[in-house]
């Protein structure tokens, strides 16, 4: 649902995009930020902090609902794009925390998760149905079927 471009001081009922119902607060002011295209791409709560009627004041800054886990601070970078701290980088890689929208990174995450189980490094152990675009190399000790 495309919201009309309104000046900041005008009020209108904010509708939930998925449900089509007004929010609990009913009327909130619209920030011009909502109509900038770089923020319209994601319907994330942290980009629509006025959804709970708090505005952009101290109450909004101190509410933990839209901070993306950053305890009282606004979310600065997108969840999939954040850089882990240096000491956590190995752990993040081991758990396969990579950019989720890239198939290559998905594959690399599988590689990192499966290399210990299958005993041979840098060979990819996957069913062919998962990633048909990639050449899948099976490990010798893996009893999965060879993809065609």
Curated annotation (Swiss-Prot):
Listed Basic residues bias regions: 83-99
Biased composition (Basic and acidic residues): 64-82
Region Disordered: start-end pairs: 38-99
Protein name per UniProt: Uncharacterized protein ORF5
Organism this protein belongs to: Fowl adenovirus A serotype 1 (strain CELO / Phelps)
